[in-house]
């Protein structure tokens, strides 16, 4: 059973790599973005609350996010393992995830961090905005999202590094090459 996280800045290719890891390892990929969208679409109480923050481009507060993730991790398809994308973002969420896993006598096996230069990410996200017509992907918003990511995630990364389960992979390059690096890193981490 593989229980892992994938973290990285906006535009680093987390979603793409999460799909590929999921297919290759046979674990369910769980994106907090997908959880939020499903709750918003279903107009659940948590979804209605989350929508207020999402509409302003803000992170959804821990209290809401934690409950959504807890509910998702209680579903039967995660019994054979999971790959969480976009959670935890804060050290409080790290602690909450630890509690969820401890209740099932589980722990994380690997925390994979995709790394990339901010300027490359800005360039990549601006290109994606032109292709998709996403109005929320202008340079100021992109830089704000990157700043938020760095501000919140550094402590999370440090916590997992202390535990010896963090592995970093360069997220820049052709998608297949990044996937090869990711899979090699996962195998090395699992063998350690």
From Swiss-Prot:
What sort of enzyme, by top EC class, is this? Answer: transferase
Q: Where is this region: NMP?
A: 31-60
One GO biological-process annotation of the entry reads: AMP salvage
Q: Which CDD domains match?
A: ADK
Instruction: Note the Gene3D superfamilies from the entry.
Output: P-loop containing nucleotide triphosphate hydrolases (3.40.50.300)
GO terms under cellular component: cytoplasm
Alphabetized UniProt keyword annotations: ATP-binding, Cytoplasm, Kinase, Nucleotide biosynthesis, Nucleotide-binding, Transferase
> So, what pathway does this thing act in?
Purine metabolism; AMP biosynthesis via salvage pathway; AMP from ADP: step 1/1
Q: Which PROSITE patterns match?
A: ADENYLATE_KINASE
User: Where does the UniProt annotation locate this protein?
Assistant: Cytoplasm
| One Gene Ontology term of the molecular function aspect | ATP binding
Q: Where is this region: LID?
A: 127-137
InterPro entries per UniProt:
Adenyl_kin_sub (IPR006259), Adenylat/UMP-CMP_kin (IPR000850), Adenylat_kinase_CS (IPR033690), P-loop_NTPase (IPR027417)
Q: Which domain of life is it from?
A: Bacteria
Q: What is its EC number?
A: 2.7.4.3
Name the residues that bind AMP: 32, 37, 58-60, 86-89, 93, 134, 145
**Any idea which positions bind ATP?**
11-16, 128, 173
Q: Name one Pfam family in it.
A: ADK
Which reactions fall under this protein's catalytic activity? AMP + ATP = 2 ADP
Subunit and interaction comment? Monomer.
Its family remark reads:
Belongs to the adenylate kinase family.
Entry comment, domain topic = Consists of three domains, a large central CORE domain and two small peripheral domains, NMPbind and LID, which undergo movements during catalysis. The LID domain closes over the site of phosphoryl transfer upon ATP binding. Assembling and dissambling the active center during each catalytic cycle provides an effective means to prevent ATP hydrolysis.
What is this protein for, i.e. what is its function?
Answer: Catalyzes the reversible transfer of the terminal phosphate group between ATP and AMP. Plays an important role in cellular energy homeostasis and in adenine nucleotide metabolism.
Q: What is this protein called?
A: Adenylate kinase
- Natural source organism: Pseudarthrobacter chlorophenolicus (strain ATCC 700700 / DSM 12829 / CIP 107037 / JCM 12360 / KCTC 9906 / NCIMB 13794 / A6) (Arthrobacter chlorophenolicus)
Its taxonomic path starts at:
Bacteria, Bacillati, Actinomycetota, Actinomycetes, Micrococcales
């Amino acid at each position: 059973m593989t229980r892992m996280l994938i973290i990285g800045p906006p535009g680093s290719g987390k979603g793409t790599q999460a799909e590929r890891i999921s297919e290759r390892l046979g674990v369910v990929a769980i994106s907090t973005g997908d959880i939020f969208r499903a709750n918003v679409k279903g107009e659940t109480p948590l979804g209605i609350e989350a929508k207020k923050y999402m509409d302003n481009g803000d992170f959804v507060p821990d209290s809401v996010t934690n409950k959504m993730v807890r509910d998702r991790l209680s579903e039967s398809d995660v019994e054979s393992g999971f790959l969480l994308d976009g959670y935890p973002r804060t050290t409080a969420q790290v602690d909450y995830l630890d509690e969820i896993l401890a209740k099932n006598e589980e722990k994380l096996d690997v925390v994979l961090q995709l790394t990339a230069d901010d300027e490359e990410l800005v360039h990549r996200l601006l290109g994606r905005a032109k292709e998709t017509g996403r109005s929320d992907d202008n340079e100021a918003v992109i830089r704000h999202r990157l700043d938020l990511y760095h501000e919140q995630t550094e402590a999370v990364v440090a916590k997992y590094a202390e535990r010896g389960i963090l592995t970093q992979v360069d997220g820049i390059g052709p998608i297949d090459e990044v996937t090869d690096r990711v899979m090699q890193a996962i195998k090395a981490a699992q063998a350690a």
